[in-house]
Amino acid sequence: MDKDLTYQIKELKKEKNAIILAHFYQPPEIQELADAVGDSYYLSEIARDCKEEVVVFCGVRFMGESAKILSPEKTVLMPVSNAGCAMADMVDEEGVIKLKQQYPNALVVCYINSTAKVKAHCDVSVTSSSAIKILENIDNKEIIFLPDKNLGGYIAEQFPDKNFIFWDGYCKYHNNIRAEEIIELKDKYKNAEVLVHPECKKEIRDLGDYVGSTSGIIKYATNSKNKDFIIATEEGILHELKKNNPNKNFYIPGGKILCTDMKKTTLENLYSTLKNMENEVIVEDEIMEKALNSLLNMHKLAEG
């Protein structure tokens, strides 16, 4: 890590009254520098509750938007303005409106991996760590879930009494994980436990000893007496896993699962963003007002 640049970023942070948030999929040097590292739900709480006036969000676009919607009075910056999420872009507001017309009695639940414009048409947002708790607190029997059909399928398995209508979206990195890659690793490391993110396909989830969010995977591996783990999610999580468990071994199916947009953040663009107060996240007032409802409901139902 560039110590001089790191020092300058820390000084700028004090000067600007800023907090740096980083997702588990961010590069190791960014995670090390961040004030808080976590999954989407945890980071949305920090963004909402922090006292700092400036939030620098090291992640992808929908995360910065969610932070701005939850804290409109704060300045939210992103080191890379074009760090997107292909899954979030698979659904548009016209598609949501059409589905709502088709299923007028359905509650519209969106994965937080959605754009602000889509959230504006949804009743509640969920994250992979909060989804089950939230759905437990929802009485509706008919649910439109978007955009991730894999996470939606996992949630639907926990609620057989509810009827789910899915959007045909997915995370290409999780969706591309193949069962053979996991079986191959299981043959090599006989006692390894398989920890799977619910954005994976059902055939991958079925191979898992545990299915859960990034924070859930880290907690499970840390508490387990096992020494070997096969990790079916983006490889950025390995930094926190190895940091918490230096004597344990972690293996990625296929050897590599890398989200290119999550890896766009660098110390250089983080420094530039703070120094010049650039790449501010702007969400139109009308969209922000409508989208806020789904995020407030997320926190209310997850904490209820």
UniProtKB/Swiss-Prot annotation:
Signal peptide: none
InterPro entries found in the cross-reference section: NadA, NadA_sf, Quinolinate_synth_type2
Gene3D superfamilies assigned to the protein according to its UniProt record, in alphabetical order: NadA-like (3.40.50.10800)
Top EC class, one word: transferase
E.C. number: 2.5.1.72
Residues the entry annotates as binding [4Fe-4S] cluster: C85, C171, C259
Cofactors required: [4Fe-4S] cluster
Primary localization class, coarse: cytoplasm
Annotated metabolic or biological route of this protein: Cofactor biosynthesis; NAD(+) biosynthesis; quinolinate from iminoaspartate: step 1/1
A single GO molecular function term of this UniProt record: quinolinate synthetase A activity
Family label: Belongs to the quinolinate synthase family. Type 2 subfamily.
Name this protein carries in UniProt: Quinolinate synthase
Native source species: Clostridioides difficile (strain 630) (Peptoclostridium difficile)
Gene: nadA
